[in-house]
């Protein structure tokens, strides 16, 4: 028996309730290795392992990693023999790859029962097993059903549950043996496929990697340990299992002891050494119970390996105890993180599911209300947008902010057009004065010159105003389209109908807005301002136009140029500046008003009314609410994930800890 410190306390043989290479030997069931393996864990072990097994059965592993022990090894490393010794059942054996699917081996110790029970689960199949001899056959059937009858492999799990008073409380994941060369009907890239499957499991930080290595090979060259070191370079979550110590060449036993004592290739969790049934033992029909007794005798009598037994590093019972202890410690360590991950995933999926909404009702009456809700939500988003109250991301700007920026640019364009250099204005006025001044004496303002200049300057602003209209219209159309996508993306016909309305209304209102803008500029060709308004503006210009500023205006001109500028030109300039102030105020405000009215207010209102008109034709409800093919599948997928995680949260909440 093995005590809690892993030492041998007596030499009683282990029970004889084992398989004899597919046959059952029921001669002795009075005491089993499991009786001594988990005595200190009776209240803690099973609940911990059951919790993780139940989460795995729920499919939570599809969403996040669960604590596990994964068993890996090269072909012919003795991996199957180790698992047989732990479980008491024969697993598939033979040449080539015999483990073709990941096998979740759930061992459950029965305290007050003697009856052996087994269950194989895969896909939608669940097979109860009453005799251990049936396990190998059922596992092979499951692998053929999942991976085909050839030599291919699959990532899909097979679950084998063994309940017996003679097994430890333990869950292991057996992975295919590592192969290098395709044999027989195996795919040419079987080596790559196998390593890819193994790496998928051992890469996870939640997995303890159980690496099986024969004693009679150089440990540094084994592929399994090399793969484990790639994903766990510090050896924090790797346990080495040394097998076949009876095949070690004479004189090399000391090297094996050094490896087992963690002196060669260091692993923080260390090494164990076991001697399981070999092929000859199987042919001689040596039972697993007999094999365990022979293993114990082997280590007790071996001059080199006896020390490993004394240190608790040898035999299958000690291995079972260590694995159970490591798994429980690992589960307890990862539970808080697991609980947080499940909570975060639950919240994330809940939020994602909201984007897909609820299922479309089958009842026509309910379908109408469903469509009304959809249209109202869309119209509310449009209202928020045109009122400048829509929700945006941290690094995003509201539509109205973007439009306001365009209006600021428009004001800058006006200033740039009006504020030409004084020298250029004087030259322009001089040209008009020479061309249009008639019989007036110097000092009399030529109104024609003033009128032509101001009309020309205002006319130059018309096309920039129309360009601004097109820019803002495109911005609004994109924003409306984004709202349509956010609300109706899963309903292809409704989304397409909405986009069509957005485009049609845009085309109509953009034409109306452009017509209004051009009409405004036509009216601006009438030079007009209220008398009292103009007089105040002219007075401000004249007060500002001091002698010093006049000097600055003409300082860049030559003496000849200054002498050619007469009093009438100065007078025209003052009138131009005065009128420009009032024209600037009108144009800089009125053009944005036109755009806001047509491209925000009317556009939004017409779109909202157009969407509500869809309710008038009841025959189109089903057509409008026809979902994209992937939408319902995605919603179903998210609901299933949410249900899994919700169940997982409830089970974690009930766990005593």
Curated annotation (Swiss-Prot):
Residues 98-100 are annotated as: G2 motif. GO terms for biological process: defense response to virus; innate immune response. Its main location: cytoplasm. GO terms for cellular component: cytoplasm; endoplasmic reticulum membrane; exocytic vesicle; perinuclear region of cytoplasm. It comes from the Eukaryota. Induction: By type I and type III interferons. Residues 569-657 form the GED domain. Residues 174-177 are annotated as: G3 motif. The keyword Ribonucleoprotein does not apply. The modification N-acetylmethionine is found at residue 1. Coiled coil: none annotated. The keyword Endoplasmic reticulum applies. Residues 63-336 form the Dynamin-type G domain. It is a peripheral membrane protein. Residues 363-627 are annotated as: Stalk. InterPro entries: Dynamin, Dynamin_GTPase, Dynamin_GTPase_CS, Dynamin_N, Dynamin_stalk, G_DYNAMIN_dom, GED, GED_dom. Residues 362-529 are annotated as: Middle domain. SUPFAM superfamilies: P-loop containing nucleoside triphosphate hydrolases (SSF52540). Residues 540-559 are annotated as: Disordered. Residues 540-551 have a biased composition (Basic and acidic residues). Residues 337-362 are annotated as: Bundle signaling element (BSE). Residues 275-278 are annotated as: G5 motif. Residues 73-80 are annotated as: G1 motif. Interferon-induced dynamin-like GTPase with antiviral activity. This is Interferon-induced GTP-binding protein Mx1. It comes from Canis lupus familiaris. The lineage of its organism: Eukaryota, Metazoa, Chordata, Craniata, Vertebrata.
